[in-house]
């Protein structure tokens, strides 16, 4: 009987190994949270791409008048504002912004 009781604690050690199997799941869940962060990184590149379009406006207009340069800059700024506004609407609530406008 004493030997049998000695073997039982060994069985208690095995559930600890099973708990180690549970711990990796929580880092995996936090890893899914990091994937959400990657999704946010997918939103940020849109604004640099828009600014990149503005830079394309800088490169090409050497053969174009300064008025067209100014117009292209206004369009680029308007695109950036339009990209920022939907994010603000989602954060603060579209109804409040629509009412203020």
Curated annotation (Swiss-Prot):
Please give the Pfam families that the UniProt record associates with this protein.
Glutenin_hmw (PF03157)
Q: Where is the composition biased (Polar residues)?
A: 1-27
Amino acid composition bias (Low complexity), ranges on this chain? 41-62
Give the superkingdom in one word.
Eukaryota
Alphabetized, the UniProt keywords read:
Disulfide bond, Repeat, Seed storage protein, Storage protein
Q: What terms describe the molecular function in GO for this protein? A: nutrient reservoir activity
Q: List the disulfide bonds.
A: none
Chain residue ranges for the region called Disordered: 1-65
Q: Tell me what else is known.
A: Glutenins are coded by several genes on each of the group 1 chromosomes of wheat.
Give the protein's biological function. Answer: Glutenins are high-molecular weight seed storage proteins of wheat endosperm. Thought to be responsible for the visco-elastic property of wheat dough.
Subunit and partners: Disulfide-bridge linked aggregates.
Q: Which family does it belong to?
A: Belongs to the gliadin/glutenin family.
UniProt name for this protein: Glutenin, high molecular weight subunit PC256
């Amino acid at each position: 009987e004493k030997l049998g009781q000695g073997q039982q604690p060994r069985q208690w050690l095995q559930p600890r190994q099973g708990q180690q199997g549970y711990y990796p799941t929580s880092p995996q869940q936090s890893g899914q949270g990091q994937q959400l962060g990657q999704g946010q990184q997918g939103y940020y590149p849109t604004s640099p791409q828009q600014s990149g379009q503005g830079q394309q406006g800088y490169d090409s207009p050497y053969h174009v008048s300064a008025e067209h340069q100014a117009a292209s800059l206004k369009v680029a700024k308007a695109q950036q504002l339009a990209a920022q506004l939907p994010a603000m609407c989602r954060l603060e609530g579209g109804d409040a912004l629509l009412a203020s406008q």
